[in-house]
Each structure stands twice: as structure tokens, then as C-alpha cells.
Amino acid sequence: VAQREGGAIVILKFFWKFLYIVVNEKTMMNLIIDEGNSSIKIALFEENRCKIFKKIENETVLAQFLQEFSLGELKAAVVASVVKDAEQRFSFLNNILPEVLYLNALSPMPFVNKYATPQTLGIDRLALAAAGVHHFPNCNVLIIDAGTCITFDVVTKNKEYLGGAIAPGIGMRLRAMHEFTSKLPLIEEQDYDNEEFIGNTTQSCMLSGVYCNVVQEIEGVIGLYKQRFQDLEVILTGGNHFYLQKRIKSRIFASSLVLVEGLNAILEYQKQL
């Protein structure tokens, strides 16, 4: 009897240990860090789903935010930064996470990089390409990021990143007209909802010339890529994607999470290497 009771206790202990591992495995999350020049975007992914997405000021705020989570809830982190000394400034992550990945242009990616100068390729464009492969793994994909610049990046159905194009963004175009002329005013980016494309004031002419023309430009670029690549899927993201997605007539997938989704896809890919 004693032996049977002892065996039952061992089995019960094993069961609870197994249950603890299973539960914790399901709740463990990836920490995604995208550091730009003026702010840091962070996201938490659980089983490839974004659970939290927010913008913070600096790494000190990040450290405070991470105190809300218990040991074991976070399993890995990826850091993509355009600022120097990222590994030094985020070194505290090594004390609370078993795996921290710092990305650079030569890091392994879930696609073949055909770019002629890979060392000059921004981490953001690599992450967008990875997101394209993640969302449409067997398709030709054009990823458009409408931010400070408007970038166009294409990944083939064979998972080959070819490159794309870089154009001035909306804010850059508005500032350029002011800075390179003597009389045109400085106009800030705004939610331009005027459907009338013929401006009747200098300001409305400038706004129409930027906002309406950007829509037509993107439509034209999509058309060019569709001529080259059959069954093309189009992803739109970036700070201005909310305005653009309502006006672009081509079928697109639009989301503000594309870049962090790409970073999470890269992290998951490198775990398997």
C-alpha cells in the first residue's frame, strides 16, 4: 500500500510539473523592440499574436514597464535600433530574458536577400519583408510603408527579397515646398479629408498636390508591380496608412503592426536555426 501511495505521489508531482510547464509555455511571450530616433515602439507577442503594442520614450520607461511581468512570462526579445550603442543601453534585458537578439543588416532572415548592397539596407525594410513572407508565404508581396519616407519592398513567392523604391513621405514633401521656395507656407501633416482635388487657396493647392498625388503615385506603383508579378499581394503600413487605405482602390491588406510582426517573425525564424 505504501509503495502504491508513494507511486501515486510521484505521478501526481510529475503531473503538476507537466501542467506547470504547459501553462507557462502557453503564456510565455516575445518582446519586440523597435527603436527609432525619437521614440521606441514595443510589442508583446504570444503565439504570433500581438497582445500589447505601445510607444514609449526611452529604455528607462521600458525597464519600468517590464517590472509588471513575472519571471518566465517573457521568453525572448528582439531589438531593432537605428541608434548607436543599442546593445549597451538594452543590456539589462540579458538579466531578465534567456534570449536577446540584436538585429543588423546581415542577420539571418526568413528569405533570401538579393539586395546588391545588403550592408546599407535598413532593419525596418528587412522586417517589412519578413512580415510579407509571414502573411503571404507562397505569394509575391509588395509592402508599402508610408512613413517619413514611403518605401516599396517586394518579396517573391520563392521568398527572395529583391529591393524596391524609396520616395519622400507626406511630411517631407510639405516641408520641401516651404524650404525650397520663398513664399510657400509651412504646412504640417494633417487628416486631409477634402475630396475636392482642385485647390482654391495656396494651402489647399499644396495639400492637394501632396495628399492626392501620393495616392495616385502609390496606385501607379502597385500597377507597375502587378505587371511584373502575377497574383501580387499588397501590404500597407506606416504612420500615414490610415489616410491612404481609405483612398487606395487597389485591394490591400492594411495594418499598423506590420513592422513589429516582421520583427517577431525574424525572432521565431532565428530560434529554429
What are these regions (language model features)?
Residues 71-122, 156-170, 200-211, 215, ...:
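Short beta-strand-loop/turn "lid" adjacent to the catalytic site in phosphate-handling enzymes
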Residues 1-27:
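N-terminal amphipathic/basic-hydrophobic helices that include classical n-h-c signal peptides
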Residues 110-141, 262-273:
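Conserved phosphate-binding catalytic cores of ATP/NTP-utilizing and phosphoryl-transfer enzymes
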Residues 17-109:
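N-terminal glycine/serine-rich phosphate-binding loop of ATP-dependent small-molecule kinases
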Residues 229-273:
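Long hydrophobic alpha-helical segments typical of transmembrane helices together
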Residues 28-47, 132, 138-161, 177:
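Gly/Thr-rich phosphate-binding beta-strand-loop-beta motif of the actin/hexokinase/Hsp70
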Residues 139-144, 162, 183-192:
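Short, structured loop/turn "capping" segments at alpha-beta junctions
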Residues 167-228:
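Active-site rim beta-loop-alpha module in soluble metabolic enzymes
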